[in-house]
């Protein structure tokens, strides 16, 4: 979404304890659906439903992690950094601050410039 969602929509998503647990876990490190199910003690279908809802509001990001053997899977990281609510002259305004998750484990840079920059940093 390019615009911040309505306050009620964001609060509705955040009122769900499973969604909050997923955000909390993925704010520490990117996690797969199975890792989230184990960490947050919920079923994988519950994880997928909540992740989809969080993605609808750009509160979590999905990327593909690639293992050394070529297998790949989705990992999720919270993009929500801060939510502030302001009451001014009879109306509420919400401001959602997002962060760019760091590179996910197993993620390979696909852009040549990214690969070169990474190589240069490691010299």
In which residue ranges do the predicted regions lie?
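Short, cationic-aromatic polyanion-contact patches
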Residues: 4-18, 32, 65-87
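Short helix-to-turn junction characteristic of helix-turn-helix DNA-binding domains
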Residues: 14, 23-30
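A short acidic, leucine-rich amphipathic alpha-helix
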Residues: 22, 35-41, 54
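Short coil turns linking two alpha-helices in DNA-binding domains
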Residues: 29, 43-45
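Residues within the DNA-recognition helix of helix-turn-helix
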Residues: 50
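Glycine-centered, phosphate/nucleic-acid-interacting loop/turn motifs that mediate DNA/RNA or nucleotide
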Residues: 58, 64
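Amphipathic alpha-helical dimerization/coiled-coil segments
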Residues: 81-123
């Amino acid at each position: 979404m390019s615009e911040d969602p309505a306050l009620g929509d964001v609060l509705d998503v955040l009122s769900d304890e499973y969604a909050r647990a997923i955000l909390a876990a993925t704010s520490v490190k990117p996690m797969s659906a199975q890792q989230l199910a184990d960490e947050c003690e919920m079923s994988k279908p519950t994880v997928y439903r909540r992740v989809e809802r969080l993605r609808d509001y750009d509160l979590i990001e999905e990327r593909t992690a690639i293992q050394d053997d070529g297998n790949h899977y989705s990992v999720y990281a919270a993009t929500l950094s801060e939510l502030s609510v302001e009451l001014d002259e009879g109306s509420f305004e919400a401001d959602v601050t997002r962060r760019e998750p760091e590179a996910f484990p197993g993620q390979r840079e696909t852009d040549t410039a990214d690969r070169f920059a990474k190589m240069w940093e490691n010299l």
